[in-house]
């Protein structure tokens, strides 16, 4: 169980805000720094899947902006240059993955859930606000459930 908790913590460790998590001698940070910018569709594709149900936490028209001061970031992360470069590359990777999702959606190969309203950020800790955001998401999910069933064939 401790190993599972460490892996969960590592999956949400935001560089610059939290120290990396070490598992079996290897440091880990948030998976959003990977090849798809935080939308883990690549693993499913490598496993041979060709239809996807994706839940996004940003609205449909969201575009992630480039890092404003990459040189400053490189200095701050000088002991972890790969992390700095991944943070700098993340917006382009994320936006490319979102574009790929739009293409998959147009081809009928993806159902992408986009929130109509997202009243909290990923740094929110106020439990009341988090519960309100959860309730909004559940209401939207319940309204879209018939469409989900059609896409999933259930």
Where are these regions (language model features)?
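Patatin-like phospholipase
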Residues: 1-154
């Amino acid at each position: 169980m401790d190993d599972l908790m460490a892996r969960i913590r590592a999956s949400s460790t935001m560089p610059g805000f939290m120290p990396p998590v070490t598992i079996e001698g290897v440091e880990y940070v948030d998976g959003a720094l990977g090849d798809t910018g935080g939308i883990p569709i690549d693993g499913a594709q490598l496993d041979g899947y060709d239809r996807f149900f994706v839940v996004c936490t940003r609205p449909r028209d969201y575009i992630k902006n480039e890092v404003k001061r990459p040189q400053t970031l490189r200095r701050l992360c000088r002991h972890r240059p790969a992390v700095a470069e991944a943070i700098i590359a993340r917006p382009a990777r994320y936006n490319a993955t979102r574009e790929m999702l739009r293409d998959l959606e147009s081809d009928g190969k993806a159902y992408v859930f986009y929130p109509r309203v997202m009243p909290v950020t990923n740094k929110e800790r106020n439990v009341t606000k988090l519960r309100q955001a959860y309730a909004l998401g559940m209401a939207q999910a319940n309204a879209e459930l018939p469409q989900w069933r059609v896409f999933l064939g259930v």
